[in-house]
Amino acid sequence: MKVVLLVCLVWMMAMMELVSCECWSQADCSDGHCCAGSSFSENCRPYGGDGEQCEPRNKYEVYSTGCPCEENLMCSVINRCQSA
């Protein structure tokens, strides 16, 4: 019984964390983050660092798999951040 309660508690904490990071637009995210994901599970994610997955910046600020790169980096044709 204790194990079941512990699992439920951990699950609830994980769900609360996911909900607290949800976003509807870029304005919902703090500096250094973008709103990315599918239309049902968008959340604030950090901008890509050197070698990390990225999506090119776009005028609509809509990203599905990842954020654009951090400043001074560019998103390559293979969707990885690299030096500009």
From Swiss-Prot:
Molecular-function GO term, any one: toxin activity
One protein family per Pfam: Prokineticin
Localization annotation: Secreted
Stretch forming the signal peptide: 1-21
Disulfide bonds: 23-35, 29-44, 34-67, 54-75, 69-81
Gene Ontology cellular component annotations, sorted alphabetically: extracellular region
Top-level division of the source organism's lineage: Eukaryota
Tissue: Expressed by the venom gland.
Stored InterPro entries: Prokineticin_domain
Keyword DNA-binding attributed: no
Family named by the database record: Belongs to the AVIT (prokineticin) family.
Protein name per UniProt: U8-theraphotoxin-Hhn1g
Protein species of origin: Cyriopagopus hainanus (Chinese bird spider)
